[in-house]
Amino acid sequence: MSNAQEAVKTRHKETTLIFPVLALVVLFLWGSSQTLPVVIAINLLALIGILSSAFSVVRHADVLAHRLGEPYGSLILSLSVVILEVSLISALMATGDAAPTLMRDTLYSIIMIVTGGLVGFSLLLGGRKFATQYMNLFGIKQYLIALFPLAIIVLVFPMALPAANFSTGQALLVALISAAMYGVFLLIQTKTHQSLFVYEHEDDSDDDDPHHGKPSAHSSVWHAIWLIIHLIAVIAVTKMNASPLETLLDSMNAPVAFTGFLVALLILSPEGLGALKAVLNNQVQRAMNLFFGSVLATISLTVPVVTLIAFMTGNELQFALGAPEMVVMVASLVLCHISFSTGRTNVLNGAAHLALFAAYLMTIFA
């Protein structure tokens, strides 16, 4: 490392931990309040606490990702997102009428927010700035090959069954299939086909990579410890804020699916912003690795974990989407296959994905 690089090394200060700690104190003292202004204030503070720690999780995971390189970097970020999601879902599973459909709604929202909103917005911005962007076609195809059957099996196939849902045995089998599929994917991503997930013309210089920021002066162990601390902070605030959140959503008469949309938006916002920065730096391969890696890891790992939690706690899970949601999700996945079929994208690809994202929003708020 050059002297110039040494000079810009930064020491991370974990002052953002103040927000989740403050939120926990307020939730402990006034979390049972039913007064609407108090409930709104508590939820806003909890939101700030969750987002501050979620951004810190991604920040520390990003440093570790930068040191390990691709594809391990994207893998760390994807797994961090899954841990955040499982903690949010498990915290909310025991409360509210939305509990049986919460995992389904969250998975559907994550698929659509990523494949419609984030991918569309990224390709639109990147296309406006660079006209045409390039990526490793074969790497994107690996994500889609694994993602398409999992999404269909978990969210579409149950509607064709006699009870329009999985039995307990079928749900456990689907959980096993999901985990096994991810295991196979990890094998090709980290062992046999690593080169598929790197575009050779990216990362020529780390100095100009805004996705990673300045080099850190801390050790990898230091970043790993703080990553875990912030994950615990997110889990703690989420669990204590579950009841105030349900109270707020009930008072707003929010649609049942809105809770899943909210959970998905919370966990994707930090990583989504980082990926958008990568696209604007013409590193679209890294951004797509993050986007599709998060979706694939979310389905593959959330389904087994939440299914086991539901099985052990006696909670019911509803898997099948409604007809409008099925149409929009399948259309978005097919569009991904079309958009990335040549390894080149432009603003038209982005506009098409955003059109389907608008259709997704209609299914939530219709």
Residue ranges with predicted function:
Residues 1-366:
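Hydrophobic alpha-helical segments, chiefly the membrane-spanning helices
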